[in-house]
Curated annotation (Swiss-Prot):
Top-rank taxon, per record: Bacteria
Protein name as it appears in the record: UPF0246 protein FTW_0267
Gene Ontology CC: cytosol
Native source species: Francisella tularensis subsp. tularensis (strain WY96-3418)
Family named by the database record: Belongs to the UPF0246 family.
GO biological process, one term: response to hydroperoxide
Pfam families: H2O2_YaaD
């Protein structure tokens, strides 16, 4: 069983004290190609491309121009699971997971990324900003199409080493489209979270993101390897709701 989640635009590069064996990014050649493209963008072009403020565009410009794709160590990079800092990761709270759970996560959790493709928890990453939906082309393909065959091939290779061949999709649509479901030789299971508002159940972005992190933590801490145990998730008021679920989707409501 492998979980996939989205990355986060917010990143924390404060040093941490750990004794983990960090790993290098999976797709180094592709990262070099992408970062070289990004380095050609001036501040004003970044602002338009990423639809961000001038100040933020300057920060992104600086990040990409200081990026060294040939060097990943503690001086310029940090393990991904401790770096991403958005709502999903606030639910995950990786810095409070014990060592054995982090080591388990290394083989059961993957983060999708516009720049890195697939990221394992202990892969070292440098500061960047490149959402999967960004309107750039590489080798004549839009970004998620560029990554699709590479990510899917790598996932199939990882699943060849897994006993339970189920992909738990806790990523957003923007990122999960970088996986070719038809070419993935495993079961695909989506998970959704809904809130009861005035008698109607709705998926609310900020709550769903944090819940994805909570679910990721639940699966990792409990070493869950089957769907029936996922249904037992009962955190932050969420419970499995069969009325909104089917064989390819588990929905949890509160």
């Amino acid at each position: 069983m492998i979980i996939v989640i989205s990355p986060a635009k917010s990143q924390n590069f404060e040093p941490i004290k750990t004794a983990y064996q960090f790993t290098q990014p999976i797709f180094k050649q592709q990262i070099i190609k992408l970062i070289n493209i990004l380095k050609h963008y001036e501040v004003e072009e970044i602002e338009k491309l990423m639809k961000i403020s001038p100040k933020l565009a300057e920060e992104v410009f600086a990040k990409h121009n200081s990026f060294n794709p040939n060097k990943y160590d503690n001086s310029n990079a940090k393990a991904a699971i401790f770096t991403f800092n958005g709502d999903v990761y606030k639910g995950l709270e990786a810095d409070t997971l014990d060592n054995k759970t982090i080591e388990y996560a290394q083989n059961h959790l993957l983060m999708l990324s516009g720049l890195y493709g697939l990221v394992r928890p202990l892969d070292l990453i440098q500061a960047y900003r490149l959402e999967m939906g960004t309107n750039i082309k590489i080798d004549g393909k839009i970004l998620h199409k560029y990554w699709q065959d590479k990510i899917t091939t790598q996932l199939n290779e990882y699943f060849s080493q897994q006993q339970n061949k189920i992909l738990i999709n806790l990523a957003s649509n923007e990122y999960s489209q970088a996986i070719d479901k038809k070419s993935l030789a495993v079961k695909w299971l989506d998970i959704d979270f809904k809130e009861n508002k005035a008698g109607a159940y709705k998926t609310i972005g900020i709550h769903a993101k944090k819940a994805r992190g909570l679910m990721t933590r639940y699966i990792l801490e409990n070493r869950i390897e089957n769907v029936s145990d996922i249904k037992k998730f009962n955190v932050a008021g969420y419970q499995f709701n069969p009325d909104f679920s089917d064989e390819n989707l588990l929905c949890f409501t509160r």
